[in-house]
């Protein structure tokens, strides 16, 4: 005899009050990930995924749009307060933080977590334009 089909349960959205926004700003792209305190991702967005291609991905405006998209998606979880971790030397660092502030989040702290080598790998050669 066949088993009765299990009813698909509705996935319950958990509510999170405090979160962390990780902004990875490289020279070519900007990635914004919003997580809870344990590091579980709630939402994310990138400049490339926001419709920008090529050299337009690495602009401050593209980082702003990506941060707005990630911020709006994380509002569904009831997020209010954010700590911001900024990593990398890219042009979208400040504009992404400003966009998250404009989404209505209360930003408690902004931390620069850019990894700095203790004379590790050899850097790329200088550009000759």
From Swiss-Prot:
Q: Name one Pfam family in it.
A: Ribosomal_S11
**Domain of life of the organism encoding this protein:** Bacteria
Whether Thylakoid counts among this entry's keywords is no
GO annotations of cellular component type: ribonucleoprotein complex; ribosome
Family matches, as InterPro entries: Ribosomal_uS11 (IPR001971), Ribosomal_uS11_bac-type (IPR019981), Ribosomal_uS11_CS (IPR018102), Ribosomal_uS11_sf (IPR036967)
> Single Gene Ontology BP term?
translation
Which keywords does UniProt give here? Ribonucleoprotein, Ribosomal protein, RNA-binding, rRNA-binding
A GO term for molecular function = rRNA binding
Per UniProt, subunit arrangement is:
Part of the 30S ribosomal subunit. Interacts with proteins S7 and S18. Binds to IF-3.
Family note: Belongs to the universal ribosomal protein uS11 family.
Its function?
Located on the platform of the 30S subunit, it bridges several disparate RNA helices of the 16S rRNA. Forms part of the Shine-Dalgarno cleft in the 70S ribosome.
PANTHER family of this UniProt entry? 40S RIBOSOMAL PROTEIN S14/30S RIBOSOMAL PROTEIN S11
- Please identify the protein, giving its name as recorded: Small ribosomal subunit protein uS11
- What is the source species? Pseudomonas paraeruginosa (strain DSM 24068 / PA7) (Pseudomonas aeruginosa (strain PA7))
Species classification: Bacteria, Pseudomonadati, Pseudomonadota, Gammaproteobacteria, Pseudomonadales
What would be the name of the gene that encodes this protein? rpsK
């Amino acid at each position: 005899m066949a088993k009765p089909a299990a009813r698909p349960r509705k996935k319950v959205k958990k509510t999170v009050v405090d979160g962390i926004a990780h902004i990875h700003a490289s020279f070519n792209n900007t990635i914004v990930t919003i997580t809870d305190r344990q590091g579980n991702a709630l939402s994310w967005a990138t400049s490339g995924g926001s419709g920008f291609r090529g050299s337009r991905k690495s602009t401050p405006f593209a980082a702003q749009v990506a941060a707005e998209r990630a911020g709006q998606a994380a509002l569904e979880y009831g997020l209010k307060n954010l700590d911001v971790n900024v990593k990398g030397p890219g042009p979208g660092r400040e504009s992404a933080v400003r966009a998250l502030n404009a989404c209505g989040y209360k930003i408690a702290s902004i931390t620069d977590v850019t990894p700095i080598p203790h004379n590790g790998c050899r850097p790329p050669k200088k550009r000759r334009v």
